[in-house]
Amino acid sequence: MSADDSFPMDQISSLFPQLENIQLVGAKGPQQIFTATLKSNFAPVMLRVVPTEEAGIFGWDPEFIVRSLTIVEQSHQGLLHVYEVGQAGPFTFIISEHPPYPRMADMETLPQISPQAALNLVRNMAEGLLTLHRKNIFHGGITPKLICLREDGGDALLLPINIYPAQPPVDMGDFASPEWVTGAETTFTPGMDIYALGLALYILLTRKTPMEAGFAMPSSLIKCSDAVDSAVSRAINPDTRERYRDLGGFITDLDKAIANPSGRNAASIPPPSSSPAIPALNMQKGQSNIYYYLIPALIVGIVPVSYTHLRAHETRGNL
């Protein structure tokens, strides 16, 4: 977007007197994205504004605003804080926390984290989302671009608002669930969020996508337990009948995995054959691959070809 297309900065400044140091950092269609600082507490924030008459392009309809206002009232260590949602002048806007941590889309800049840390990160986000699911608010747009990772291994932070609710699976890329891409589900469900968190966990554990890893279970690539394999494979099962029904079940199994994260040493495990047999539906202890679970996702193009491809998709455009 050229400078001539941007909203006048004096107009933005006058409409948002609670902010200072406002800087335009990107755009997506009619939506413009600014970084700024809250005057009240000096917190770094991100301001997203869309002309109200065009807000429907992104799904920013009255129902979206009502859901977002509910999110503003929530506070959890696994969720980025959403400070304000509403209308100002001709714009509909969202003001959210903007921490200085790298995004999961840029995780190659961070050192490898332990299985325990990866499990804790995803559990923390899952627990935060559960507070919203209990109010029948489902994200439906989780991607690595919306997940911040602290370099010190602390809590992951997920932006709890689906910024482009009208546009998945295009903007979600490989994190869109199979049922959303195929049209089997036309509204957001808990399972869609679970699928995205499960895929995030696989990548955090292995630094690979399932396809890059030949559909191997995490324990075939790193030292982790069967409990870790079980939680990951069930979360990303493309069959919604076999996937976790709710985040509570996922969190329960994550807790089991956190209690016993270590397992066999991946170096001592022979690599899976080039033509692995399709395992039975219910994962057995020690099973070495997730081939069965991901074949349907591969057919509809859900499983990412590579993490490099995924990152390129996620970082294309703007924040």
Where are these regions (language model features)?
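Activation segment signature within eukaryotic-like protein kinase domains
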Residues: 121-122
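AlphaC helix of the protein kinase catalytic domain
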Residues: 104-113
